[in-house]
Amino acid sequence: MAARKTKHACRIQDKRSDAERQDLDTKLAAVLESRGNANAVFDILEHLESKKEEVVQAAIRTASKLFEVMLEKRELYIGDLPAENGTLPDTYSAEDKYKMWMRHRYNSCAACILDLLQHSSFSNQELALCTLMKFIQLEGKFPLENSEWKDSYRFPRELLKFVIDNLLQEEADCTLLITRFQEYLEYDDVRYYTMTVTNDCVSRVQQKNKLVLPPVFQTNVFCLLSSINIPVEESALGNFLVTKNVNNEDWKPSKLKDHKRVFERVWMIFLKHQLSVSLYKKVLLILHESILPHMSKPTLMIDFLTAAYDVGGAISLLALNGLFILIHQHNLEYPDFYKKLYSLLEPSIFHVKYRARFFHLANMFLSSTHLPVYLVAAFAKRLARLALTAPPQVLLMIIPFICNLIRRHPACRVLIHRPSAGDLATDPYIMEEQDPAKSQALESSLWELEVLQQHYHGDVVRAANVISRPLSAQESDISGLLEISSCELYDKEMKKKKFKSVPLEYEPVRGLLGLKSDITAQHFTF
């Protein structure tokens, strides 16, 4: 009985919704047919505040159709709009007053749809966003400003500002809607003005919150900024949401250098604030590919990267990529860089998520043949000591890594040829020393690799046995070993070819004394 009542109520509600949608269509037709029906616009806008999701969607579509026609027919007042409640001078005609009134209704409509960006239904949020971007496109094509306006391009920056302000909420997570907005960032003009507006928004929130950015706001800003892809060449700039109708050589949205400049500015103002650990990691993960290459002056990131490198742990590992670019491509001088890199070699380095990335970068940093011998020896020795407690999948990468260091620096061969190899008790190497220059690694030997020759895993033993033979000049390729896992080792063992049968004695043993033919078994029974 209750189920029947529920179905009946749903049918009644659906009929009401259909009736409201039909009413919206009727009012839209009436407004477009005659100016005498203009007051019906209020009824259309009222439906934007409905509690029914489907009615709100219908109202958004109706309002979009209405003002699209109004903009195309130039039915909205163009120029500085007087206040609605103010007294208008007699110089304005009835035509002007009607267009002013309709322009105010358009502004009210845009404000209502902006509020819907925070609607409980994502479908309504998405539709509201697409409608607002449609308004931006139409305003660009049919400007609401006088032709004497300074910006000859007349991009509707003000409406875009309101959209961005609603996407970058301080308390509500808008990352899903920002992801939907990402497709509009493919338009070069939208991308450029989004960056300028975001820069202003971050500055405004910063002043409001006494130089501290709320965590949710930071997440929203990062989601938006990380969605921005700057073209590599200026010739790629030509995709505009608002059609370009002027030929202005100084038009900034068409200049790659201006894109890079504002891109750099907005990232710098965002990164100067303290970030959460998770956000720190996200920024560093994309820094070397998505941020540094598109900055006018990548060296401006020195302070951020050096501060991140000094944090320690995973943050320091992730900062290596950016530092590598600045050191090798932009001649950054970092006096204690290798000392810090050396200090990152801890047992935990073998178990972190970014292990492969770290050793890939460490291999590049240690590839120079101009490094001091004591420094390379310290890295080789520290890795060898850590290898004593490392899992097999890591050892298969660490041992060739150490051997490559020795190949690059023949002076380090003393570490594997020194007669007095010693052991843990007599080893002069100081594991606790953070300064590689004071670790006495060059006075030690790589006896740890000899210990690994007794490892339980056969592949590790074969890798460690390399030092028992003369090292070849050709370096080992460790790229395929950086991400090897224990599961891969296990699968490899399981796939090894097994003997179909094991040869056994064909005559079974009887008793403790062996076969029946044995002389002892013939005289004694057990």
From Swiss-Prot:
Keywords, comma-separated and alphabetical: Membrane, Nucleus, Transmembrane, Transmembrane helix
Entry annotated with the keyword Iron-sulfur: no
Membrane topology: Multi-pass membrane protein
GO BP terms: ribosome biogenesis
Transmembrane segments: 307-327, 358-378, 386-406
Localization (cell): Nucleus membrane; Nucleus, Nucleolus
InterPro entries in alphabetical order: ARM-type_fold, CCAAT-binding_factor, Noc4
KW DNA-binding (keyword) present: no
Cellular component GO terms, alphabetical: Noc4p-Nop14p complex; nuclear membrane; nucleolus; small-subunit processome
Family per record: Belongs to the CBF/MAK21 family.
Name listed for the protein in its UniProt record: Nucleolar complex protein 4 homolog A
